[in-house]
Regions:
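Active-site-proximal cap/lid insertion segments
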Residues: 5, 27, 31-180, 215, ...
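Active-site segment of extracytoplasmic enzymes that catalyze sulfate/phosphate-ester chemistry
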Residues: 1-3, 8-14
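N-terminal small/polar-rich segments of proteins
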Residues: 210-211
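Acidic, His- and aromatic-enriched active-site or binding-groove loops in soluble protein domains
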Residues: 13-30, 38, 199
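Two-component system phosphotransfer/interaction surface
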Residues: 169, 186-190
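Residues that form or immediately flank small-molecule/cofactor binding pockets and catalytic motifs
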Residues: 2, 146, 190, 204-206, ...
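Polar, glycine-rich mid-to-C-terminal structural blocks
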Residues: 183-187, 196-206, 217
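Glycine/proline-rich active-site loop of Rossmann-fold NAD(P)-dependent oxidoreductases
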Residues: 176, 195-196
Length: 239
């Protein structure tokens, strides 16, 4: 995957990759780690990004009748097949993540490593990717850090990907600046009670220019526990 847009150093005329040094595999990265030194790395998978694998070809036992079709999508066999293909892609990512966890364990690094698994957007369906509806902004997130993250809990709280900044600072022993809007997730992960957020803000600006004239569908929004308010800044561009 790419850590920034457009993702090509050559096309942007940059002299270095702003996302950091790129490695061919997680195994290669770990092989080059200095012994006893802290490290930070991120893995951006192409799963579950379209094009999706045909679930029937993978023979994973998924059945169209088992698919859960959201109310805003038509309950049609084609849609059900697409949902199964998406589920198959999620399983592919799960296998990739499992391989990296096993590599950490084999090198004796697993228990001392904070692992964050999340996504940058919802699935690539209507109201999903590059949209500010819940199916586009409500994404999975899981943390693992033995002895420092309470395992097996499910947290019902508003969090933002911006909160990863403060989370990584705290995990590294670096003070979080008082004027930083990012909130560390570690207190919640430890099972502690904290004030947290009562709403999250979302926006869409330039991503996925799918309107005439290579224009985007600019949106600003806020989501609390009761309502979602979205404002289209350029309504003349259509939905």
């Amino acid at each position: 995957g790419k850590g920034w847009s457009p993702g090509s150093v050559e096309e942007s005329r940059r002299t270095r990759n702003p996302a950091g040094v790129k490695f061919a595999s997680c195994d290669e990265f770990m092989a080059k780690l200095p012994a006893g030194k802290p490290f930070w790395s991120w893995f951006s998978s192409r799963h579950p990004h379209r094009p999706w694998t045909d679930a029937r070809e993978n023979k994973v036992g998924l059945r169209p009748e088992d698919a859960v079709v959201p109310p805003h999508l038509p309950d049609h066999p084609t849609v059900r097949d697409d949902i199964l293909n998406y589920a198959c892609e999620v399983m592919d990512f799960d296998r990739e993540a499992g391989e990296m966890v096993r590599l950490l364990e084999a090198r004796g690094l697993l228990d001392d490593t904070l692992i964050v698994m999340t996504s940058d957007n919802g699935w690539q369906m209507p109201r999903g990717l590059a949209n500010c509806y819940d199916s586009g902004t409500r994404i999975p997130m899981a943390l693992r850090w033995k002895a420092k993250v309470l395992a097996g809990q499910s947290i019902d709280a508003f969090v933002s990907l911006a909160d990863l900044a403060a989370t990584f600072l705290e995990a590294s022993g670096v003070p979080v600046p008082e004027d930083m809007e990012s909130l560390s997730l570690l207190p919640l992960a430890r099972g502690e009670t904290q004030a947290g957020r009562d709403a999250v803000f979302v926006e869409r600006e330039r991503h996925a220019n799918v309107r005439q004239g290579d224009l985007s569908y600019t949106v600003r929004g806020i989501r609390n526990r009761e309502f979602r308010y979205l404002r289209q800044l350029n309504p003349d561009r259509g939905p």
